[in-house]
Curated annotation (Swiss-Prot):
Gene (name only): aroA
Top EC class, one word: transferase
Active site (record annotation): 310 (proton acceptor)
PANTHER family per record: AROM/DEHYDROQUINATE SYNTHASE, PENTAFUNCTIONAL AROM POLYPEPTIDE
Species the sequence originates in: Syntrophobacter fumaroxidans (strain DSM 10017 / MPOB)
Entry protein name: 3-phosphoshikimate 1-carboxyvinyltransferase
Length: 423
């Protein structure tokens, strides 16, 4: 599917944002570990979260989708033995968290995925879980899928996690730690990539009744065994998805209200609003959401985005239209996402005539020179590339997004929502 974007100015819209992908993943998995049934309200129903839910079903978890919610019934025995490999598509979050989840139970589980997922590393997670007694067999390439988990539960003890490439390695170990046979001391190497997602994991563990103590900046002590509590959970709206709508306001001199969102969000990507303010936008929190207003004139920025790497494609588009040179730093881990996001963003900016330089850990972008592309924008099978470059098409004509259906990974209603910017 190909989508042609028509330029527009002076957008004024009020838009609803779907549930958070990151929180939905974690809520499903913590519910699977719980001692009772859970109801998750406002879950994101998208390719990635469906992959997580389907994998849990293969492991014996009851998952029942309903309009506006999902019911999760944990199995009496952790876990059932799958008759076939558990296929995870291109979902890195599903992969990292489910490997740890499987290791908390008993059984033999094989995980595999799409060719790109087979290129995304899991070695740091495997090494950490092996310190707690888990056994793994990477059946083709060491440290990558396909991979067997030979599960006999986790012992207690000390574990050191190298999460400098992905905070998901640390989140996975922390989520599994309460299920171990004895107290687990989790330490990690710094800096952690995308640390706010780790903070989200800890907050959600606490909400489900798990006791832990963070006695150092890089250490958490988790008493074990503990049981997660079941119950009701409401998933907040996705700040990452909202960012494309905020960027649309910023780029077109618009006024966009997104809801339901709160300044108390667990999501680190909500801090992207502060970046928009630095670039010249006005941000106002209202009763049920946040409003972004812009004149369309943007200032360049020089930023370390290690803690919100998913915002890099969006920021790169804004930088392409800002008045000067912008730099995005400390995001080398973007090279092992759904695509090599640094290379992909740089390549597609070139199609818009935007001078840019790909750095080992980031991008340098000279704004103000964007022109209509002569060829389609290739999202590189990456949902965030497709959505970010759709925003660029609001400012310059002729932008066509190839393989536009890739947005279903995280924001299935993106194109319908995007159309509402014009109404």
């Amino acid at each position: 599917m190909r989508k042609t974007i028509e330029p527009i100015s002076g957008i004024k819209a009020q838009l609803s944002v779907p549930g958070s992908k990151s929180i939905t993943h974690r809520a499903l998995m913590l519910a699977a570990l719980a001692d009772d049934e859970s109801e998750i309200r406002n879950p994101l129903v998208a390719d990635d979260t469906t992959i997580t839910a389907d994998a849990l079903v293969q492991m014996g978890v009851g998952v029942q989708w309903k309009p506006g919610s999902v019911l999760v019934a944990p199995p009496s025995k952790r876990w059932s033995q799958p008759s076939e490999p558990i296929l995870l598509g291109n979902s890195g979050t599903s992969t990292r968290l489910l490997l740890a989840l499987a290791a908390t139970g008993v059984g033999d589980f094989t995980f595999d995925g799409a060719p790109r997922l087979r290129q995304r590393p899991v070695k740091p997670l495997v090494s950490a879980l092996e310190m707690l007694g888990a056994r793994f067999d990477c059946t083709e390439t060491d440290g990558f899928l396909p991979l067997r988990v030979i599960a006999h539960g986790l012992s207690g003890g000390k574990v050191l996690v190298d999460a400098r490439q992905s905070g998901q390695f640390l989140s996975a170990v922390l989520m599994a730690a309460p299920c171990a046979g004895g107290e687990v001391t989790v330490e990690w190497l710094e800096p952690v990539a995308s640390y706010p997602y780790v903070a989200m994991t800890l907050a959600m563990m606490g909400e489900r009744g798990i006791d832990f103590r963070k006695d150092r900046a890089n250490r958490v002590i988790v008493p074990a065994p503990q049981r997660y509590a079941g119950g009701r959970w409401t998933v907040e709206a996705d700040c990452s998805s909202a960012s494309y709508l905020w960027a649309a306001a910023a780029l077109t001199g618009g006024d966009v209200l997104t809801h339901p969102l709160s300044p108390d969000s667990l999501q680190g990507d909500c801090r992207f609003l502060g970046i928009l303010e630095r670039m010249g936008c006005r941000v106002t929190w209202e009763e049920d959401g946040v409003r972004v207003v812009s004149s369309g004139e943007l200032r360049p920025v020089d930023l370390d985005l290690n803690e919100m790497p998913d915002m890099v494609p969006t920021l790169a588009i804004l930088a392409a239209f800002a008045g000067g040179v912008s730099r995005i730093r400390n995001v080398a881990h973007l090279r092992v996402k759904e695509s090599d996001r640094l290379q992909a963003v740089s390549s597609e900016l070139g199609k818009l005539g935007v001078p840019n330089r790909e750095l080992p850990d980031g991008l340098e972008i000279r704004g103000g020179a964007a022109t209509s592309p002569k060829v389609g924008i290739d999202p590189h099978d990456d949902h965030r590339i497709a959505m970010a470059f759709a925003v660029a098409g609001l400012r310059v004509g002729g932008v066509e997004i190839e393989d536009a259906e890739v947005v279903a990974k995280s924001f299935p209603t993106f194109w319908e929502t995007f159309e509402k910017l014009k109404s």
